[in-house]
Amino acid sequence: MRVQEKAPGKLYLAGEYAVVEAGYPALIAAMDQYITVTAEKSESGRLYSSQNPSLVLAWKRESGQLSFSMKHPYASIESAMRTAETYAVEQGCSAQGHYHLSVDSELDHAETGTKYGLGSSGAVTVAVIKSLLAYYGLSKHPLVIYKLAVLAQMKLEMTGSFGDIAASSFGGVIAYSSVNRTWLSQAMARQSIKELVDSEWKNLEIRAVQLPMSIQLMVGWTGASASTDQLVQHFLKIASFYKNFHRPWAWSSRHPC
């Protein structure tokens, strides 16, 4: 058995930092560059990525859990695998046997490995989950994929709005408002993955947008990668400062008259 799925990268058109806070929208476009994941039934479990051609990881099942042979740089892939496998079991699938998972990326420079900034972490999470849902014969509805991918990244304590995941899951151009992370963290502590996927998520909005035909996108690349986590933390620090600066009590205490 062999299945292959792909997920596009993303580009924020507006609201890249506003959307980090629940309830604030962003406009995001999926790109025509992809991460492709192939899952093929095999005698032993293996994981390969074009980003590290010389590294082929072995994995196996121990007490119903995935176990990798060594430490590796594929935290997003492993978390996506674990999340998809757990969901498959909760859906009544028999997650037994092994498969070879192959990841091929168009979202980084082929020679240097430098990322283009098109949401490779989100895209690879989505592509892995799509491929394993197909492997187990489960629904690949974009909202199901989005929720599973978000849960996989939440387990890694990744920051950001998950807008890249939304764009990779739904494709096209979307208007997106992020889920309330506090609510989701609390829900994850008391609900199964299936229950979370089946529930309505607080503040989450994903809507397809049709741009005018007269609009053409021209994308430039700086040639340097950037850390989403670091940029988001910097934004949140500034946002927190200005929220405190504008609090009414701060002004009234300075101007008692």
Give the role of each language-model region.
Residues 102-104:
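Solvent-exposed beta-strand sheet faces enriched in polar/charged residues
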Residues 2-14, 18-20, 28-95, 106-111, ...:
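C-terminal nucleotide
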Residues 6, 106-128:
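Glycine/serine-rich anion-binding loops at beta->alpha junctions
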Residues 98-100:
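Residues at or immediately flanking beta-strands
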